[in-house]
Protein backbone atom coordinates (compact mmCIF):
# COMPACT_ATOMS: atom_id res chain seq x y z
CA UNK A 1 0.00 0.00 0.00
CA UNK A 2 1.25 3.43 -0.84
CA UNK A 3 1.25 6.40 1.49
CA UNK A 4 -1.89 7.95 2.90
CA UNK A 5 -2.73 11.14 1.03
CA UNK A 6 -5.42 13.78 0.79
CA UNK A 7 -8.43 12.44 -1.06
CA UNK A 8 -9.01 13.92 -4.51
CA UNK A 9 -12.48 14.94 -5.65
CA UNK A 10 -12.00 12.71 -8.71
CA UNK A 11 -12.05 9.71 -6.36
CA UNK A 12 -15.68 10.23 -5.29
CA UNK A 13 -17.06 7.33 -7.35
CA UNK A 14 -14.26 4.98 -6.22
CA UNK A 15 -14.83 6.01 -2.59
CA UNK A 16 -18.57 5.34 -2.85
CA UNK A 17 -17.88 1.92 -4.41
CA UNK A 18 -15.45 1.07 -1.60
CA UNK A 19 -17.97 2.20 1.02
CA UNK A 20 -20.73 0.17 -0.66
CA UNK A 21 -18.47 -2.90 -0.53
CA UNK A 22 -17.41 -2.39 3.10
CA UNK A 23 -20.58 -0.88 4.59
CA UNK A 24 -23.59 -1.56 2.40
CA UNK A 25 -26.04 -0.39 5.08
CA UNK A 26 -24.22 2.82 6.05
CA UNK A 27 -27.05 5.00 4.75
CA UNK A 28 -29.26 3.73 7.59
CA UNK A 29 -26.92 4.96 10.33
CA UNK A 30 -27.44 8.06 12.46
CA UNK A 31 -23.95 9.28 11.54
CA UNK A 32 -25.13 9.53 7.94
CA UNK A 33 -27.91 11.90 9.04
CA UNK A 34 -25.22 14.23 10.36
CA UNK A 35 -23.08 13.97 7.22
CA UNK A 36 -25.93 14.32 4.70
CA UNK A 37 -25.68 17.47 2.63
CA UNK A 38 -22.37 18.51 4.21
CA UNK A 39 -18.81 18.67 3.01
CA UNK A 40 -16.06 17.02 5.04
CA UNK A 41 -13.71 19.27 6.98
CA UNK A 42 -11.00 20.83 4.81
CA UNK A 43 -7.91 18.67 4.58
CA UNK A 44 -9.51 15.86 6.58
CA UNK A 45 -10.51 13.45 3.82
CA UNK A 46 -7.77 10.87 3.51
CA UNK A 47 -7.20 8.07 1.01
CA UNK A 48 -4.91 5.07 0.65
CA UNK A 49 -4.13 3.42 -2.66
CA UNK A 50 -3.04 -0.10 -3.49
CA UNK A 51 0.03 -1.01 -5.54
CA UNK A 52 -2.00 -0.57 -8.74
CA UNK A 53 -3.16 2.92 -7.74
CA UNK A 54 -6.74 1.95 -6.90
CA UNK A 55 -8.41 3.34 -3.79
CA UNK A 56 -8.28 0.75 -1.00
CA UNK A 57 -8.88 2.85 2.12
CA UNK A 58 -10.67 6.02 3.14
CA UNK A 59 -11.50 8.06 6.21
CA UNK A 60 -13.14 11.47 6.57
CA UNK A 61 -13.84 13.90 9.38
CA UNK A 62 -16.77 16.32 9.56
CA UNK A 63 -17.40 19.53 11.51
CA UNK A 64 -20.01 19.09 14.26
CA UNK A 65 -20.84 20.44 17.69
CA UNK A 66 -20.65 18.22 20.76
CA UNK A 67 -23.58 20.11 22.23
CA UNK A 68 -23.84 23.93 22.32
CA UNK A 69 -20.53 25.74 22.09
CA UNK A 70 -18.37 22.61 21.79
CA UNK A 71 -16.86 22.35 18.29
CA UNK A 72 -15.74 18.86 17.38
CA UNK A 73 -15.08 16.56 14.47
CA UNK A 74 -17.09 13.44 13.64
CA UNK A 75 -14.91 10.68 12.19
CA UNK A 76 -16.28 8.31 9.62
CA UNK A 77 -16.72 6.32 7.76
CA UNK A 78 -13.42 4.48 8.01
CA UNK A 79 -13.28 1.80 5.33
CA UNK A 80 -10.57 -0.56 4.10
CA UNK A 81 -10.94 -2.96 1.18
CA UNK A 82 -11.20 -6.55 2.50
CA UNK A 83 -7.98 -7.54 0.72
CA UNK A 84 -6.03 -4.95 2.73
CA UNK A 85 -7.52 -5.39 6.21
CA UNK A 86 -4.79 -7.63 7.62
CA UNK A 87 -1.95 -5.19 6.91
CA UNK A 88 -2.81 -2.48 9.47
CA UNK A 89 -4.17 -0.01 6.94
CA UNK A 90 -7.15 0.92 9.11
CA UNK A 91 -4.80 1.81 11.97
CA UNK A 92 -2.60 3.85 9.64
CA UNK A 93 -5.64 5.76 8.36
CA UNK A 94 -6.78 6.41 11.94
CA UNK A 95 -3.34 7.64 13.01
CA UNK A 96 -3.13 9.91 9.96
CA UNK A 97 -6.62 11.31 10.57
CA UNK A 98 -5.93 11.99 14.26
CA UNK A 99 -2.52 13.50 13.52
CA UNK A 100 -3.90 15.75 10.78
CA UNK A 101 -6.80 16.91 12.97
CA UNK A 102 -4.39 17.67 15.82
CA UNK A 103 -2.00 19.54 13.48
CA UNK A 104 -4.92 21.65 12.22
CA UNK A 105 -5.76 22.70 15.77
CA UNK A 106 -8.96 20.73 16.37
CA UNK A 107 -9.93 19.97 19.97
CA UNK A 108 -11.83 16.69 19.85
CA UNK A 109 -12.98 13.84 17.63
CA UNK A 110 -16.19 11.85 18.06
CA UNK A 111 -17.22 8.63 16.35
CA UNK A 112 -19.69 5.79 16.58
CA UNK A 113 -17.80 2.52 16.52
CA UNK A 114 -16.41 -0.58 18.15
CA UNK A 115 -14.90 0.53 21.49
CA UNK A 116 -12.27 -2.26 21.69
CA UNK A 117 -10.90 -1.31 18.26
CA UNK A 118 -10.88 2.47 18.79
CA UNK A 119 -9.57 2.35 22.38
CA UNK A 120 -6.04 1.78 21.07
CA UNK A 121 -6.20 5.27 19.54
CA UNK A 122 -7.41 6.81 22.82
CA UNK A 123 -11.17 6.86 22.15
CA UNK A 124 -13.56 6.12 25.00
CA UNK A 125 -17.14 6.70 26.11
CA UNK A 126 -15.92 8.37 29.32
CA UNK A 127 -17.08 11.90 28.34
CA UNK A 128 -19.81 11.16 25.78
CA UNK A 129 -22.57 10.05 28.16
CA UNK A 130 -24.42 13.38 28.03
CA UNK A 131 -24.24 13.61 24.23
CA UNK A 132 -26.69 12.10 21.81
CA UNK A 133 -27.07 11.59 18.08
CA UNK A 134 -30.12 12.10 15.89
CA UNK A 135 -31.94 8.86 15.21
CA UNK A 136 -31.18 5.38 16.45
CA UNK A 137 -27.67 4.43 17.57
CA UNK A 138 -26.00 2.27 20.17
CA UNK A 139 -25.08 4.64 23.00
CA UNK A 140 -22.11 2.56 24.20
CA UNK A 141 -20.55 2.97 20.75
CA UNK A 142 -20.49 6.80 20.91
CA UNK A 143 -16.82 7.50 21.62
CA UNK A 144 -14.67 10.59 21.98
CA UNK A 145 -11.01 11.53 21.86
CA UNK A 146 -9.78 14.80 23.31
CA UNK A 147 -6.94 16.25 21.26
CA UNK A 148 -6.71 19.02 23.85
CA UNK A 149 -7.16 18.11 27.51
CA UNK A 150 -10.62 18.99 28.81
CA UNK A 151 -12.11 19.62 25.36
CA UNK A 152 -15.12 17.40 26.16
CA UNK A 153 -15.59 18.62 29.74
CA UNK A 154 -19.25 19.59 30.10
CA UNK A 155 -20.16 18.36 26.61
CA UNK A 156 -23.91 17.88 26.66
CA UNK A 157 -26.65 17.84 24.05
CA UNK A 158 -27.30 16.88 20.47
CA UNK A 159 -24.37 16.29 18.13
CA UNK A 160 -25.18 18.56 15.20
CA UNK A 161 -23.54 19.25 11.84
CA UNK A 162 -21.81 22.59 11.38
CA UNK A 163 -19.72 22.02 8.26
CA UNK A 164 -20.19 23.65 4.90
CA UNK A 165 -23.28 22.55 3.06
CA UNK A 166 -23.09 20.94 -0.35
CA UNK A 167 -24.17 23.49 -2.94
CA UNK A 168 -27.33 22.25 -4.61
CA UNK A 169 -28.74 24.32 -7.47
CA UNK A 170 -32.36 25.36 -7.26
CA UNK A 171 -34.91 24.03 -9.71
CA UNK A 172 -35.15 27.51 -11.26
CA UNK A 173 -31.36 27.57 -11.81
CA UNK A 174 -31.48 24.13 -13.45
CA UNK A 175 -34.32 25.20 -15.77
CA UNK A 176 -32.49 28.42 -16.67
CA UNK A 177 -29.30 26.51 -17.42
CA UNK A 178 -31.18 23.99 -19.57
CA UNK A 179 -32.94 26.80 -21.45
CA UNK A 180 -29.64 28.57 -22.14
CA UNK A 181 -28.04 25.44 -23.59
Predicted regions and their residues:
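Conserved acetyl-CoA-binding loop-helix of GNAT-fold acetyltransferases
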Residues: 75, 80, 86-99, 110-111
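Conserved glycine-rich acetyl-CoA-binding loop
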Residues: 54, 68, 81-92, 104, ...
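Conserved active-site alpha-helix within GNAT-family acetyltransferase domains
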Residues: 103-107, 113-138
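A short beta-loop-alpha structural element at the N-terminal edge
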Residues: 2-15
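Short loop segments at secondary-structure junctions
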Residues: 50-53, 83, 146-151
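A conserved beta-turn-beta hairpin within the catalytic core of GNAT-like acetyltransferases
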Residues: 64-75, 85
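Active-site rim helix/loop that mediates acceptor-substrate recognition in acyltransferases
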Residues: 20-60, 64-65
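C-terminal "cap" of GNAT-fold acetyltransferases
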Residues: 132-178
Amino acid sequence: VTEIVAEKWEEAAARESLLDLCMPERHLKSSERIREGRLPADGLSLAAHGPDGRLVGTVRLWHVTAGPGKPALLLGPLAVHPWFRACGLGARLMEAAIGTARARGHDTILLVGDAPYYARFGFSAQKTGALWMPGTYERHRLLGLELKAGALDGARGLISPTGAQVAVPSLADLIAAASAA
